[in-house]
């Protein structure tokens, strides 16, 4: 009998992204192949300029790679035209960035519902789900608060709820704790990790704070556009986490 093939929610194959500059061709992402399963939370780390943010933008279907494949649920994002990539982004990808980009004049629940509204999926079930998700994130009493009436950590939780509300296959986070103090950062990432596992999403978080890797299943390290190391065991990951505490 043959061995069953693993079906990953996300798989990239030899992804390359180059830019032309006055000094020549810049290789921002250099032959990166990775896989993330449903229900797996992965951290992407590396020094400034390592290519991790460019890679995340490619995975979010915001940038097209120069070459390579990006398979999301088996569909190649790299071959899509701009219109189809926008549709894919709305339907299958959730993302939250360092700046949470909440609409300042919408309440917490309205900000979360906005993603469903954009997808023409805002019905009674969607409205109930938005409230339940915010309550799960500890914001049950903040549903009608505007962003300016919430702390940075609370705003980031609203952004997480918005990223998850439309049941995406892939959830991406770019430095979600950069503006938070350590205690709130831990709370946000621990909650985010729990939801990724609980809901069976594939999750990737870019972070400069190695301490936040405590809550992930694997750590992928980039340098000079290349994927140079993968930390898979708890001992390896906690060694990396502890190095960030010094």
Indicate where each model-derived feature is located.
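Short, Lys/Arg-enriched N-terminal segments with co-localized hydrophobic residues
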Residues: 1-4
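ABC family nucleotide-binding domain
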Residues: 8-215, 219-222
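Conserved beta-strand-loop-alpha-helix hinge in the C-terminal portion
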Residues: 226-246
């Amino acid at each position: 009998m043959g061995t069953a093939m693993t079906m990953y929610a996300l798989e990239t194959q030899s992804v390359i992204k180059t830019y032309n500059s006055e000094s020549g061709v810049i290789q921002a992402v250099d032959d990166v192949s990775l896989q993330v399963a449903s229900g797996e939370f992965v951290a992407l780390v590396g020094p400034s300029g390592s290519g991790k943010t460019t890679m995340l933008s490619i995975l979010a279907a915001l940038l097209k790679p120069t070459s390579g494949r990006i398979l999301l649920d088996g569909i190649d994002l790299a071959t899509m035209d701009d219109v189809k990539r926008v549709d894919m982004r709305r339907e299958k990808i959730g993302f939250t960035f360092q700046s949470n980009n909440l609409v300042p004049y919408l309440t917490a629940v309205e900000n979360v519902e906005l993603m469903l509204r954009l997808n023409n999926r805002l019905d009674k079930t969607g409205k109930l789900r938005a409230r339940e998700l915010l309550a799960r994130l500890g914001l049950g009493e903040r549903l009608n608060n505007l962003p300016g009436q919430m702390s940075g950590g609370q705003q980031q939780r609203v952004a997480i709820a918005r990223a998850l509300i439309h049941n995406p296959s892939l959830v991406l986070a770019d430095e979600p704790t950069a503006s938070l103090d350590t205690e709130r950062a831990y709370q946000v990432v621990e909650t985010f990790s729990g939801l990724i596992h609980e809901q069976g999403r594939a999750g990737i978080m870019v972070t400069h704070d190695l301490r936040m890797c405590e809550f992930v299943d694997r750590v992928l390290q980039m340098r000079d556009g290349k994927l140079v190391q993968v930390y898979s065991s708890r001992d390896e990951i906690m060694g990396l986490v502890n190095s960030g505490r010094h």
